[in-house]
Amino acid sequence: ASKRGGSKAAKSATGEKAVARKVSSLTLEQKVAQMFFPRPEALTGMGQVTAAGDTTRKAFANIPVGGMCYFSQNLQSESQARQMLSASNQISLDEVGLPLFMSVDEEGGTVSRVGGNKGFSVENVGNMRDVGDTGDARRAYDVCKKIAGYLVPLGFNLDFAPDADIVNGTSQTMAKRSFGTTADVVAPMVESAVKGFLDGGIMCCAKHFPGIGGAQGDSETEAIATDKTLDQLRQEELVPFERAIATGVPMVMVGHISCPKVTGDSAPASLSRAIVTDVLRGELGFDGIIITDSLGMGAVAGLHKARDLAVAAIRAGVDMLLMTPELTDSYQGVLDAVRDGTITEERIDESVTRIVRAKLAL
């Protein structure tokens, strides 16, 4: 498959030279740290982070992470959020000469950290299911451009949205968050959503690959699975992701759903080379950033020790590790794995090249 997706950065010869130069200027420790995407509390060891000062700077110097994911408890007002994000980004620029991915889960409706938050004069745009039910894909474009319009001035450069999941089972987890119940409805909505975010000047992330909308249960607390074959997934679940990739989505989040009829085992997609490397990178030709869903979720938490979880995800082919439990130990675990040859430095460089390419385009 031809390589598609990834940053809008023209992969010109000069652009790629700048990316390669930047990657080679980083130490192994810095490169591995760029693959981690914690909450600010996990980086700093504090109970609640609402500013970025000396504590953040010291913690970042120790582990210069590639991104931070913010939640409602971090966001009290527009001026506070702007200051915190601007200071956080400056720390990253000072330490590694790269901006920080600063993300939020702003899907609209039930999953919103800014819209409807009492500290912000921003209305919640509502659930994506209501948008999908209109049958008008322009609505998805308008809503996502509107979300970008209030996130960008605060300093966010990445939204963990849109949901490309199809609700084709009895799962309540995605019932309101997804655009609908068939690929015919969801795919054009996802395409328009991605365009809306990108035109609004923010990176976005299609999730939760290869689609968690039909699974029983909630991966937040428990293991979930699908008994579909790869052919069945190709007909429905994968279609919105293919459309997102064709539209230039810069990032895809892999969910914690087991696909035993595809992989032959019970490993969740986020830790499965068959799903991440063979299907998403290989068959779908996605060359942007692949990030895991939160590695603190119940679906994966009990499978490995924290450090082994991070190593397993990288070996599956992911580029970034979201909300890894025990950040310091996980980081050290990946460094140890590179030093003992379990993971090659070339493998780390592949991921960091994708991260740097996207960051230099911000």
Range-by-range predicted roles:
Residues 1-61, 282-283, 302-362:
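Preference for extracellular/luminal or secreted protein segments
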Residues 30, 39, 72, 89-92, ...:
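Sec/Tat-exported extracytoplasmic proteins
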Residues 41-43, 47-49, 58-188, 208, ...:
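Enzymes and membrane/adaptor proteins characterized by extended Gly/Ser/Thr/Asp/Glu-rich
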Residues 47-52, 231-245, 271-276, 300-304:
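A general structural motif
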Residues 277-290, 294:
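Catalytic PLP-binding core of fold-type I/II PLP enzymes
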